[in-house]
């Protein structure tokens, strides 16, 4: 059982690293690079966004949910209060991710309004995802 705990916690951390790290990379590296390149900015964001959406939003978030449930089951002592908060925030992140990827992000190429929406949904998603990392730390510390 110890091996299972380690395996699922490892997978959960790797997936969270991919998800949050990807958003940090997009906002701190890709976006500033493309800011001064208006001729390719929109198309580049569309292409990068599609790829990250597939692996980040759909695959990572689904697997984070599964590994999170398994990790919750494997924690001895039952549910911690932080788990309930983390689940609530997680579902908000999923909703915002879908709104960003399937609505605002897709229309951002053709509409300034949607580009602004996509930007702010992405920022909100990053902040909430960092909150999820913090809550994960609290859970591992027994809170």
UniProtKB/Swiss-Prot annotation:
Entry's transmembrane regions: 7-29, 52-74, 87-105, 120-142
InterPro entries, A to Z: TMEM205-like
Alphabetical UniProt keywords: Cell membrane, Membrane, Transmembrane, Transmembrane helix
Keyword presence, Transmembrane: yes
Predominant cellular place of this UniProt entry's protein: membrane
Leader peptide range in chain numbering: none
Pfam families from the UniProt entry: DUF4149
Keyword Cell membrane in record: yes
Cellular localization per UniProt: Cell membrane
GO CC annotation: plasma membrane
Membrane topology term: Multi-pass membrane protein
Record-given protein name: Uncharacterized protein aq_363
Taxonomic source organism: Aquifex aeolicus (strain VF5)
């Amino acid at each position: 059982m110890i091996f299972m705990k380690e395996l699922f916690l490892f997978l959960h951390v790797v997936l969270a690293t991919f998800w949050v790290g990807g958003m940090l990379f997009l906002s701190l590296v890709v976006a500033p690079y493309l800011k001064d390149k208006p001729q390719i900015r929109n198309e580049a964001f569309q292409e990068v966004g599609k790829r990250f959406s597939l692996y980040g939003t759909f695959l990572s978030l689904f697997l984070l949910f599964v590994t999170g449930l398994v990790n919750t089951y494997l924690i001895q002592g039952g549910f911690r209060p932080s788990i309930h908060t983390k689940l609530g925030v997680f579902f908000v992140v999923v909703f915002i991710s879908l709104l960003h990827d399937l609505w605002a992000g897709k229309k951002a190429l053709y509409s300034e309004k949607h580009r602004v929406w996509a930007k702010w949904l992405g920022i909100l998603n990053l902040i909430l995802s960092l909150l999820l990392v913090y809550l994960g730390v609290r859970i591992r510390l027994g809170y």
